[in-house]
Amino acid sequence: MRTLGVIALAGIGASVVCLAIAHAIDPGVDQFRGFRGDGFGFMFRGCSTPSDDSANITRELEWHGGDTVTINVPATIHYRPDNGPTLRASGPNDIMSHLRVRDGRVELDCRMYGFDRELNLVLPGRTFDSFILNGTGHLVLENLRQTELNVSLRGEGDVRATGMADDLTLNIAGSGDADMGQLSVQSSKVRIAGSGKAALAPRDSADIFIAGSGEIRFLEQPRHLQTHIAGSGRIINAPTTGL
């Protein structure tokens, strides 16, 4: 019994440490965060579960927010700098009526349970420096041309980016997957807490921290590399080219 108690306490301690590391890497991480994204979503009414034959509709919503976009709904999200000025959203009529944009957050005005159909979101073409994806979802960033790019995955979502950015900051808390191999960057700073994966190709420098079993694959080897790994995480260097 004493052994079982020690094991249980060790497990609890490890969980607390992991949560603390995740919060240190990305202060926005909150284990109680739901699709509302405010940390207290359990206090609000639930959405009605959409029927299987609920018709899809498309809505256009005015964008309210600055240079940070936070996605708190399960969705496939597309962004291009040449998109229009509004958020275009498609999905089941039963759910779309609850969709809101508040201070750069795309979320629902109710709690959603038992919903396995993703929404489709097309973000406005204004410049965003930061993209935050909470929970599940697919974030597609195309034809970027910007100085700074900050991407945070909290949960099990994934992101793919193409284009150019001078400086990339990538935070993954959970099991997210980031494909940045087709994004041309000078320098990158990557923080992974959990089992997340990332592929990237920084030309000049990379600062890497992994807590857990995360994995980073370099498609192009940076000239300057700084690493710290706590756990079973690993870094796969770019293959060397023979002369």
Predicted feature residues:
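Intrinsically disordered, low-complexity terminal regions
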Residues: M1-R154, D158-G163, D167-A173, D177-Q182, ...
